[in-house]
Amino acid sequence: MPAALHRRSWVPAASEDHVLAIAADAAARDAAGVAAEVERLVADSHRIHDVDGLNLNPATNVMNPAAEALLSRGLGSRPSLGYPGDKYEMGLEAIERIEVVAAELAAEVFGARFAEVRVSSGALSNLYVFMATCQPGDTIIAPPPAIGGHVTHHAAGAAGLYGLKTVPAPVDADGYSVDVVALAKLAREVKPKLITIGGSLNLFPHPVPAIREVADSVGAKVLFDAAHLSGMVAGKAWPQPLEDGAHAITMSTYKSLGGPAGGLIVSNDAALMERIDAIAYPGLTANSDAGRTAALARGLLDWKVHGTAYAAAMRDTAQALARALDALGLPVFAKARGFTQSHQFALEAARWGGGQRAAKQLARGGLLACGIGLPIAPVDGDINGLRLGVPEIVRLGFTPEDMPQLAGWIARALAGDAPAVAAEVRERRTRLNGLRYIVR
């Protein structure tokens, strides 16, 4: 039978050709064939990520197997509307306790008084805060893509879809953050309701106390987007945003935090969290995935017990890899500042034709990464940086002592020796044994 999906004129032609070919293949199979194909694809993904490759993408991680197992225990299809102790549906005595345990662990780990665990993604976490602090038509100030500002803070993402006007924050290129002096001037001019900080690449601590002073001067709130920094914050290897003045922290729970896919909001501001609570229920979340909440609770327990050691290991390993790449002559961004103080850093990617081209070359060598924007000269037709991170490989057992070898693989793969590198990476994976920094 022909595919039910039709061509979408607004999608790039090459992507849509690929989509329709997959759809046609699925439509041509009987039920058993589709089931077999899904199983094959799941196994293939496992091979790519867990057998043949090493993930240097800081936007991903591996979960504690005990947490991951909770995703398939039948909780996810049980709707859970309302407050614990007064649920709309019956039979939720256990699930409501799981919700409270997850929130309590989040509050403990992030030094917060309040936690919203029902959010299904980091992007929606941002939207909840936008809605709780702003009205459509209001102005916000957010980091631009040149310093890792995320699309959800801008016109094409949640902020724009909610009707907010985003003004890019002025850039401190050397610090890969915002220029606070220029920010104060801009805030006086545009009168934002919200100032956001944090993004898809974070190298050095952001000046949150100074940003809070700017926000207070114009009556704005401060949102710290810890989508990528969540593990560093949880492990106390990074300044604590709530202590420094942020009104709320949003995050994804599956990146450096190493939990299930989803979002999380923490705050010490009761009035703000009251509004966010109403947005979550009965507003936009309604039924949440209780299986994800259980997995999140189990994952947060890892941070309560091992977080300090894990975050420090990520920082030390990222710094060691950056130094090793620099020693091989690769252009590591922010060399004058010591490359990074977090779990991630970037290469200037012009010599390889851009960050995405470089990432594709690395992937041929079994090393998975992606491009990122940097406040340097642009690259025609591509992103000008290549983002690298270590959360997953540290959890797999890699240490700073392993980084010269990994740097050599990266350099060789980028120089065209990807097939040989892929074989060496695959062999190294066979010698990995279990995960570190987890509660078993």
From Swiss-Prot:
Cofactor: pyridoxal 5'-phosphate
Keyword terms, alphabetized: Lyase, Pyridoxal phosphate
The EC number(s) this enzyme carries: 4.1.2.-
Activity regulation remarks: In the alpha-methyl-L-serine synthesis reaction, activity is inhibited by an excess amount of formaldehyde (at a concentration greater than 4 mM). Formaldehyde release activity is reduced by the sulfhydryl reagent N-ethylmaleimide, iodoacetate amide and iodoacetic acid, but not by dithiothreitol and 2-mercaptoethanol. Activity is enhanced by 1 mM of manganese chloride.
GO CC entries: cytoplasm
InterPro entries on file: PyrdxlP-dep_Trfase, PyrdxlP-dep_Trfase_major, PyrdxlP-dep_Trfase_small, Ser_HO-MeTrfase, Ser_HO-MeTrfase-like, SHMT-like_dom
Temperature-activity note from the record: Optimum temperature is 50 degrees Celsius with alpha-methyl-L-serine as substrate.
Signal sequence region: none
Record note on pH: Optimum pH is 7.4-8.0 with alpha-methyl-L-serine as substrate.
Catalytic activity: 2-methyl-L-serine = formaldehyde + L-alanine; 2-ethyl-L-serine = (2S)-2-aminobutanoate + formaldehyde
Keyword Lyase: yes
PANTHER family in the record: SERINE HYDROXYMETHYLTRANSFERASE, SERINE HYDROXYMETHYLTRANSFERASE 1
Role noted for this protein: Catalyzes the reversible interconversion of alpha-methyl-L-serine to L-alanine and formaldehyde. Can also catalyze the synthesis of alpha-ethyl-L-serine from L-2-aminobutyric acid and formaldehyde. Also shows low alanine racemase activity. Cannot use alpha-methyl-D-serine, L-serine, D-serine, (S)-2-amino-1-propanol, (R)-2-amino-1-propanol, (S)-alpha-hydroxymethyltyrosine, (R)-alpha-hydroxymethyltyrosine, alpha-iso-butyl-DL-serine, alpha-iso-propyl-DL-serine or alpha-benzyl-DL-serine. Cannot use D-alanine instead of L-alanine as the substrate for alpha-methyl-L-serine synthesis.
Family: Belongs to the SHMT family. Alpha-methylserine aldolase subfamily.
Name under which the protein is recorded: Alpha-methylserine aldolase
Organism: Variovorax paradoxus
